[in-house]
Structure formats: C-alpha cells, structure tokens
C-alpha cells in the first residue's frame, strides 16, 4: 500500500480539533502502522469529523456497504472511529436520529492512544514519547479548551460550588449507574515499558464510566460500592481527576461521566506537557487553592501532594504570589508557611483533602476567568478551532 494512504490518514486526524502533529521524522506514521492494518488505514483515511452513515461512506468510496460497515464497527472499540449519537452531530448537521448509526473519524488523544493497551509494547511507548517531544505534545495539549478537564476531588469543594457546575458532582454519577468500567492506566504501563518500573500506585485506576445495569461483574467491571470506594482510595492517595466532558459519552448536558485518575509520575498529560514545554495540559477547574497561614503548620503535606509543583514554603517566594481578592487569602507569604502559586494551580483539590489542619480551601476564580464547560461535541470543537485560528 502506498505511503500516501498513511499520510492521508495522518492529515485527516491532524485536521480534527484534537490534533495529530505532522513531524519531521514521521513518527506519527509509525504509530499508525503499529496500531492498524492497511485496509483499516485506507478506510479511516476517507473519514472526517462530519458524521455519515455506512451507506453514504460506501457510496462515496466505491466499496461494498457490508464490508465498510464491518470495518467501521471493528474500529469503534479501538477508537479510530466514533459512533455518533443524539447531540453529537458536527456543526450544521442535525443530531443523529434514534436507531440510525453515523460514523466519523476519531482522534488520537483522547481516543485511539488510550485504546492501545492491547498492543502496547516498548516500541509503541518509545514512538509515543518521541512523538510528544517532536511536536505532538504541544499540538494536542496547548490549544484551549483542553482535551480533558480537571474535576476537583470529592470533599474539596463547597456544596454551592458543585451546584453551580453539575459536571463536578461525582457522587451523582455513582447514583446514576450500578456498574462501572475501571481499566488499567495506559500511561503507567507505558512508563513501566520505558523505564522498567513505575510508581507504587494502583494500575487499575481509570475510566469509572457507567455501564448498563445488566453488565456482568468482573475484573474491570465494578459495582457501585466497589467503584466509589476505589475512587475514594485514589483520591486519598493524591490522584487527580482529569475527566471526560459529558458529551464524549453522549450525555445530554454537562455532567461527570468518567475520568482518568492521574499521578504526576506516570500521567501522559502531566508528563507530556513537561516534555513539550506546554504551560497547561488539561483544562483547569474554576477553582484555586488558598492557604490560611494561621492553621498552617508548614508540615509540607500539600507540597508533596501537589502534582504541578504549585505549592512551596513561603520563604521561597513564588512568582505568582500577589495580593489576592479572595477573602482571607494570603497577600504576602510568611516564612515557614506554605503558599500557592495561583498561576500554576490547576484546581484539583488534592491538597485540600490532604491537609491535616484543614488550612486549605478552594475559592472560585473571577467571572472574567470563568471557563464555561462545552455542552456538546460541536461546541467544544468549534471553540477549539476558533482558538487555533486565532493563533495563526
């Protein structure tokens, strides 16, 4: 098969709002070859972000509709193809009718990269690392809105904060479902392949996506109590919720639908933004940590728990420690007390629930800084494309 076939698919994926950088070395082509067959690459290369039925695709590319349908369906669980559903139509198109299947090209991240656990080996891990360094990380992580959003851990926000942003209500998610998919972390596995070891935190940590109630329990399918307890343990250990937007799971309104649970030592987003030199990876939450100096004992727990090194001792003045409008906030760091670099803080709340003296709280950002969560795939894509256009 011609190299043009792989080039076409790479260009098509890069044309998506998520991005898939074209590098000088062509490492992205090697990632595609590692993950998919030639026939799969050819058909996927004919797709775009516009939703089409299998019959429409087959007619356009001149192939048998049964053959096209079979290939498309096989690529859905591997995330190279997205199955459209109500509320997820591309701009200018009507939402998919109930019972009608429409297909569109899926992104690399979040997408077929995370679905690559079945084929993940040292070669794939090295290719991904090279891709991130050569421009892939910046292309994916730098544009806004981010491909994932930070959701503060349970117990770090006031009830009124959660009421204002229902997509932060993790407990409501557990009440909506009885079964949950929890899978191994592809990032942690990649670190093990690259370095021969990883951190001691759990491998099974990601997903927590709701499943039909009749789904059989198993190694990766947990009931409500098991899933909630596991997520609670991960929160106490300092994992950060980098959550999926509701529309990625066909939710009709912004709501919590699942999350990666990330540690700074393994996470592809945290690691990738550092390798790429990107200031911000996941979309920050609308809250920032504030430390009250009076109950703070300078124990250092928050410094150790912060995944982005946004907290330090007050004597080591941070560049973003400036007079703050938040009630009770520190306006100047006190020697020996912990202080938050507001510009670096991502609003994850990990420091809040780990403070033994309850000296840390989360405060909302100003209305000018407030990030309004996209309510549909079309909304997210259009906002990201507008951002990209403005950068040119």
Where are the regions that the model predicts?
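Short amphipathic alpha-helical interaction segments
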Residues: 61-77
């Amino acid at each position: 098969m011609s190299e043009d076939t792989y080039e076409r698919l790479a260009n098509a994926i890069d044309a998506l709002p998520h991005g898939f950088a074209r590098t000088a070395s062509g490492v992205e082509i090697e990632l595609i070859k590692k993950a998919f067959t030639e026939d799969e690459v050819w058909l996927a290369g004919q797709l775009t972000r516009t939703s089409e039925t299998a019959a429409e695709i087959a007619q356009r590319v001149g192939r048998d509709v049964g053959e096209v349908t079979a290939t498309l369906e096989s690529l859905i669980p591997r995330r190279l193809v997205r199955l459209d559903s109500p509320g997820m139509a591309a701009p200018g198109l009507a939402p998919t009718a109930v019972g009608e299947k429409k297909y569109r090209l899926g992104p690399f991240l979040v997408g077929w990269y995370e679905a690559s656990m079945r084929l993940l080996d040292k070669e794939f891990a090295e290719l991904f690392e090279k891709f991130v360094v050569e421009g892939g990380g910046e292309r994916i992580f730098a544009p806004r809105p981010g491909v994932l959003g930070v959701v503060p851990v349970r117990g770090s926000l006031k009830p009124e904060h959660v009421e204002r942003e229902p997509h932060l209500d993790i407990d409501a998610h557990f009440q909506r479902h009885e079964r949950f998919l929890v899978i191994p972390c592809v990032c942690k596995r990649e670190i093990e392949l690259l370095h021969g070891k990883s951190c001691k935190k759990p491998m099974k940590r990601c997903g927590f996506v709701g499943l039909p109630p009749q789904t059989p329990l198993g190694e990766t399918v947990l009931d409500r109590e098991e899933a909630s307890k596991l997520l609670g343990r991960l929160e106490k250990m300092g994992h950060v919720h980098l959550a999926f937007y509701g529309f990625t799971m066909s939710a009709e309104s912004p709501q919590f639908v699942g999350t990666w649970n990330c540690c700074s030592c393994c996470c592809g987003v945290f690691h990738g933004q550092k390798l790429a030199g990107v200031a911000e990876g996941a979309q920050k939450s609308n809250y920032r940590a504030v430390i009250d100096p009076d109950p703070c004992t300078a124990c250092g727990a928050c410094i150790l728990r912060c995944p982005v090194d946004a907290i330090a001792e007050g004597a080591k003045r941070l560049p973003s420690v400036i007079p703050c409008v938040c009630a009770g906030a520190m306006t100047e760091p006190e020697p020996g007390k912990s202080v938050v670099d507001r510009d670096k803080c991502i609003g994850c709340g990990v420091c809040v629930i780990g403070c033994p003296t309850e000296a840390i709280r989360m405060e909302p950002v100003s209305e000018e800084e407030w990030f309004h969560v996209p309510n549909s795939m079309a909304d997210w894509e259009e906002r990201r494309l507008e951002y990209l256009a403005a950068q040119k």
